[in-house]
Amino acid sequence: MAFTSSPSYGSLNAAFWRTIFVVHCISTLVFTTISTPPEDPVKCVSGNTNCTVTNSYGAFPDRSTCRAANVAYPTTEAELISVVAAATKAGRKMRVTTRYSHSITKLACTDGTDGLLISTKFLNHTVRTDATAMTLTVESGVTLRQLIAEAAKVGLALPYAPYWWGLTVGGMMGTGAHGSSLWGKGSAVHDYVTEIRIVSPGSVNDGFAKVRVLRETTTPKEFNAAKVSLGVLGVISQVTLKLQPMFKRSLRYVMRNDSDFGDQAVTFGMKHEFADFIWLPSQGKVVYRMDDRVAVNTSGNGLLDFMPFRSQLSAALAIIRSSEETQERFRDANGKCAGATLITSTLFATSYGLTNNGMIFTGYPVIGSQNRMMSSGSCLDSLHDGLITACPWDSRIKSEFFHQTTFSIPLTQVKSFINDIKSLVKIESKSLCVLELYDGILMRYVTSSPAYLGKETEALDFDLTYYRAKDPLSPRLYEDFIEEIEQIALFKYNALPHWGKNRNLAFDGVIKKYKNVPAFLKVKESYDPMGLFSSEWTDQILGIKGNVTIIKDGCALEGLCVCSEDAHCAPTKGYFCRPGKVYKEARVCTRADDISVIQSLSY
């Protein structure tokens, strides 16, 4: 069944999206360096007391408000030790926060209202650089952008990293953040770490705080626990990374139809070191990233300034968000698909923000140094302009507001999973335009890691971004299709969710998927026997106490539960809990009109 738009609105779709996107692109190009950076995620009523913490999107998956009695901003390791010691002596709960707080999940939250937040905002210095050993030691609040720049100063490069440079070193390690590669040690930043300094609660004899220096050669078990720690072992103070000599990359994007994508996805990562994909399933297309290492003396001064990470006019963002809300209200599938086609084709035509010389794009391949090609995020490093412009998801304005469902499928099962998604598209070709409005499904390669809470095998990471309503009880257009994909991944293929993204249901029983959990929990018990750095959320996802799912009316609409009865959806708005269309074990919130159509198609 195809949902049709209302005549008065739908007839304007193409012209509307062309107009809006022209404004959007102009603002992106013109205002790249004139933006308002994000505010501190911690806000306090008086000084550093009576505080709340949120993420950069302004809402956690359950929309709860996370409170703390105080926030501390240590500027040195000595100050950090003093903060941890005082809190340990008082038996206070603690959690670490970062400069921008990009984790969607509640990893920054402490329990109750009496806890302490420890911000690494000012632990942002380079400690030492050893060009001969090719190592760089930084404090945990250093951003990826700083890390890349510091390494480049001495002719070194981090080989793989996330594409967004606003993450901190500590944050990347806390959640297992990664780029895309099957080569070398893989794409996870933590697998290029050689030493970790971490401050944990201590005994009376320790002065209530203990500093440990962890290395793979001397403390392998503790080291592998700390590499992806969810922040439950203490506060990482410093990290030493093993780098590589600077190199260049040669990159081109190629768009193809997705007829053979299941086979290509399995093998493409071994052909290109930095390969990834942007899949547009409703359009039947895939954008292949052909991205390879070349010699540092190869001609080229290319730059990646990814367009969706640039500053944008707040007024344009508000119009785009309002249009999406209108499309949801009128169930305007045609409008979403028209917008998705325009956005994705324009991004491809503008090479996603690649330029050959930092100014203009003249053609492929784009060749540039690793520090100029691996990550971006220019909306962060700019002057305050009173929110005339901002990062596209800035919660202080009417901006993007979305869910992110991100998981890793074992490479051996990727073809089958892709075919399952294609089967859903065959049932309703417009169903996944809702993903393409947010640039499609980003797919990145990951490898197995010795980190206890790292990836278990070679896999493809699927990143789905899609509309989230401001009203938690508002159902979404085609939400049953997205929910079914989510459940196919998590339950049929046993996918591993990204620790820093996802909705609650992705973490239901997740810890059973990791074979080294007992070893991790043993280190956790040794480092923090009182659980001062743990929270209700970390206890739930680690399987220690409680459950991540929240059962209440409407809980399935925001992924707080998998529906088991109609009340978990929105029955008064015509959405009922029903089996999946391809994966019959799934339970999804389906609109009544769609149920009758699907049933008729099955006969």
UniProtKB/Swiss-Prot annotation:
May be involved in the biosynthesis of ascorbic acid. It is an enzyme of class 1 (oxidoreductase). Belongs to the oxygen-dependent FAD-linked oxidoreductase family. This is Probable L-gulonolactone oxidase 6. Residues 64-246 form the FAD-binding PCMH-type domain. Keywords: Ascorbate biosynthesis, FAD, Flavoprotein, Oxidoreductase, Signal. Pathway: Cofactor biosynthesis; L-ascorbate biosynthesis. Its cofactor is FAD. One of its GO terms (biological process) is L-ascorbic acid biosynthetic process. It catalyses: L-gulono-1,4-lactone + O2 = L-ascorbate + H2O2 + H(+).
